[in-house]
């Protein structure tokens, strides 16, 4: 406070002085020139030293005809060589010391500054000692720099003189103490002050750590006036200070005591995941809660504002203390205090008069309250009865059926008679309801007439009586006498009846249209605003609040000891060597004793789960890169991994591929992503409710966050019509979402034809994959030589010239329920999928197959051989886990997105906690893409004809094969017998098996029988002939 005031006064004095001359005198000019020369010299020295080359000619090196690498030229090479030879590696700080010395000497313009020769002499002596001892220490402890000694010739001479006598340790100690003495001589800083400063910093750090662990705020030390304040003054505090002290947490005895030393217990290494967000340990101050005010007192109470400068009793305070406080107050605060004092004087008068008025008002309310309480209950009941009778009569008299769209006209002249019955002496203040104070629950609600007009009009309008509201009971002292009411209804003319009928028809039609356009139904066309961003943003996804992962070390160590004891019960000696807590599970790494097989622990997984009271325990037999066995236990409270957490991770942001997919987080909380282009196909399997469909949606959403329709396209097959139909209308789709399994075969066959077409184009351009194809098209377009379609022929299109080749996007085929597709369409789908899985990688066509029935008749060996990447959610048995992953473990998963990921080219599974995307997240991303454009469907994908390029090996076109002579007879037999098996046709017509099979295939091509199902039977599709 004193320093701020002193600066303020000094500033005022400076502004009152005459302006100084802008010209420099002679001595000032000389000092400024010396400063410029010093800075220039330091820059030249730095350039020469940092660009030194041993090959340059110098004082210690001779060279002829070579180029000089030093940026300072020949002079710089000689200068740097001389400094390195003299001081060694300590030549690098010389330019900085020279610039600092120039600044210190020339920073003041004063001419009449006395020169203290003693001070400058000690500084020069200290600088000399510092340089010599530093060179000596560098020569002893550091390696040589190029062909110079690390301490230069100065350090070499000192070490050669001291080493024979003092040895290395003694020489180092002597030079260190001399260095400390030189530092004090040069800077004038006492080492005692340095030690005190270090001690203060250390204590402050320890106090901060203690407060952080204790969870309390840091103490605020208030300055005390030890010289002036007496003991009796210290007991008096300002009210604000007392309130501040009350808000601070008080440290009790058990919070301050040090914990007692526990017995020596084995500590387990716990590897904590990296915290996502750090929160302050200081708890926020609780906000003041609003006080409840009684309902009787409806007038606000005037609260006098508290002044900023509190008046303290100065009876027992020394006058010096008061003067010290006045010195600490600034001029602005004194002016504000004076202005506020004037305001207080006027406000006191206003508050006094307001208080008097409020007191009179409270007396009136109390008197009126007592008057109401004195009324008996029978009087209240009689008032209710009279009012109910009056309301019933009014309802009977006013009950008239109006014609459509015509409001009844009520004669309001009779209403004036009602108001005359109200006595003017019964006037009550409308602002306060005395009856509500007596009993707020027994409120009478008057019945409302049903045939009134839409706009409510008051039936009774008393001038001196408080208006009766539905929520408020009438005053008991008011009695109404019913009067006959006359209602006049206007006659409806004949011409208006047609208009009313037409309007009713229009309104009914509009009501029907509004019923069909329910806002909760999926609309085909939506007017959505076009986003400005090229890709969807993170604001579309749900962002959970900041979660803190509280990990109890003692609980984890207790579980580790329990694991060791339970394994010991089964005669297995193992030690827990590492604990890795994660968001869903915690992995305990076990070091088995010599001779213990891993198979013994694997067979005890269910027993360990029972002994540890866990849902499931998974044993990781091999941890890559470690000689330990993993034991994965579920956490007591699992965390939800949201899609926004993984998409905002650096792993996903740094990925450049448009086919990047999100899987979730591993056991350490790190994001796990993959690239479908490198998989190149993925098989997803799991039971119902294990998170399989959510995982597929997360994969699709992650690709929508990375790729535009020019880079990626989808073909979606959804037999359940629920999971993938939500993506209908996004511009990434090549065709509508396939829900009919008969159309799914055409879609897969179109993919085979597209794959063959792409292979022909890539072979013509001499590239090996889609990425190289697109890059070559880009290079050709930039060079001004666009590439035309080499396989175009006249008649293929209406163009007269071959069209230009366009960029080929990646195509991802998503099948949500592969088992239903196999069941309906049959084995032909398996052949198409196998062919795509074998060859479609280079063509940029990738498959995502999901099934909830991981059996061998669905996931066949042909499919598993061509789809190396698998994702297994929770399954029922170990057999299903082996069907998917060729190993067990999926039966021990926890469900709700818990999965095992088998990456391509690896036999070790990775446990991943799948990311969660809600329906709102999916709708938000889908609507964002729908607003950007409409899809461009290709009709041939679903309803296209079978082309020759899409046929499987051995297939023939339908037109290339002639009908069998027995075809008509076989059709008649199959339609009548309703059996279309090959063996039945063979026995009935006594032909060979191959001929019968060929005829049945012709029947299938003509749509008479269906394709063979999973059991080999065919269904007769043609209707039966009519019976005579």
Swiss-Prot record:
* CDD domains associated with the record: TrwB_TraG_TraD_VirD4
User: Example GO molecular function term?
Assistant: DNA binding
Q: Recite the UniProt keywords alphabetically.
A: ATP-binding, Cell cycle, Cell division, Cell inner membrane, Cell membrane, Chromosome partition, DNA-binding, Membrane, Nucleotide-binding, Transmembrane, Transmembrane helix
Segments for region (Disordered): 422-479
Offer one Pfam family short name for this entry.
Answer: FtsK_alpha
List the GO terms this entry assigns under cellular component, sorted alphabetically: plasma membrane
User: Where would you find this protein in the cell?
Assistant: Cell inner membrane
* Gene Ontology terms: biological process: cell division; chromosome segregation
Listed SMART domains:
Ftsk_gamma
Point to the regions of Low complexity compositional bias. 447-472
Residue intervals annotated with topology Cytoplasmic = 193-1028
Q: Which PROSITE patterns match?
A: FTSK
TM ranges:
35-55, 85-105, 117-137, 145-165, 172-192
Domain FtsK, residue spans: 669-882
Q: Record-annotated residues binding ATP?
A: 689-694
Q: How does it sit in the membrane?
A: Multi-pass membrane protein
Q: How does it assemble?
A: Homohexamer. Forms a ring that surrounds DNA.
| Domains as described in the record | Consists of an N-terminal domain, which is sufficient for the localization to the septal ring and is required for cell division, followed by a linker domain, and a C-terminal domain, which forms the translocation motor involved in chromosome segregation. The C-terminal domain can be further subdivided into alpha, beta and gamma subdomains. The alpha and beta subdomains multimerise to produce a hexameric ring, contain the nucleotide binding motif and form the DNA pump.
- Function according to Swiss-Prot or TrEMBL: Essential cell division protein that coordinates cell division and chromosome segregation. The N-terminus is involved in assembly of the cell-division machinery. The C-terminus functions as a DNA motor that moves dsDNA in an ATP-dependent manner towards the dif recombination site, which is located within the replication terminus region. Translocation stops specifically at Xer-dif sites, where FtsK interacts with the Xer recombinase, allowing activation of chromosome unlinking by recombination. FtsK orienting polar sequences (KOPS) guide the direction of DNA translocation.
Tell me its family. Belongs to the FtsK/SpoIIIE/SftA family.
Q: What's the name of the protein?
A: DNA translocase FtsK
Task: Read off the lineage from the record.
Answer: Bacteria, Pseudomonadati, Pseudomonadota, Gammaproteobacteria, Vibrionales
Gene this protein is translated from: ftsK
